[in-house]
Structure formats: C-alpha cells, structure tokens
Swiss-Prot record:
GO terms for biological process: translation. It comes from Lachnospira eligens (strain ATCC 27750 / DSM 3376 / VPI C15-48 / C15-B4). Keywords: Ribonucleoprotein, Ribosomal protein. GO terms for cellular component: cytoplasm; small ribosomal subunit. This is Small ribosomal subunit protein bS16. GO terms for molecular function: structural constituent of ribosome. InterPro entries: Ribosomal_bS16, Ribosomal_bS16_dom_sf. Belongs to the bacterial ribosomal protein bS16 family. It holds the Pfam family Ribosomal_S16.
C-alpha cells in the first residue's frame, strides 16, 4: 500500500480550503483517508497553514510520500523529510 500525504479540497466554488491528509495513493482525492494532519487556506495573505508537526514527522518516517504541493507547505512550516 503506497501512502501519500496530499490535499483534500473543501470549500465553495472559487473559494477553496484544503485539509492535509494521509491516504492510500489509489483512493479518490476527496475519498477515504487514514489520518488528517493539518489545514491550508490560501484565501488569506499570508495563507493560513496549520500542520501537526509530530504527526507529519511520524508519517514521513513511516514512508509516506508528500505530493509536490504538500512538500512546499512542509518547507513553509519548517518540517524536514
């Protein structure tokens, strides 16, 4: 089972809000997930970003692969792989 850390889109049309989730790579974007580790709201300047650093580090050490966007968000939050 390949585990990814990725974004789940919520919110309204043209007003997105995202949750950072840990999910099987084969599950749909807004489908089943294993764990929720944070939120990301790009509608503010600067953007609102909340990440549970302990949970993120735990999943990264267990082999979960972040997507490109989530990797950039981790860098913004100061979380290393």
């Amino acid at each position: 089972m390949a585990v990814k850390i990725r974004l789940k889109r919520l919110g309204e049309k043209k007003n997105p809000f995202y949750r950072i989730i840990v999910a099987d790579s084969r599950s749909p974007r807004n489908g089943r997930f294993i764990d929720e580790i944070g939120t990301y709201d790009p509608n503010y300047d600067p953007c609102k970003l909340n990440i549970d650093a302990e949970a993120a580090k735990k999943w990264l050490s267990n082999g979960a692969q972040p997507t490109e966007v989530v990797g950039k968000l981790f860098k913004m939050a100061g979380i290393e792989k």
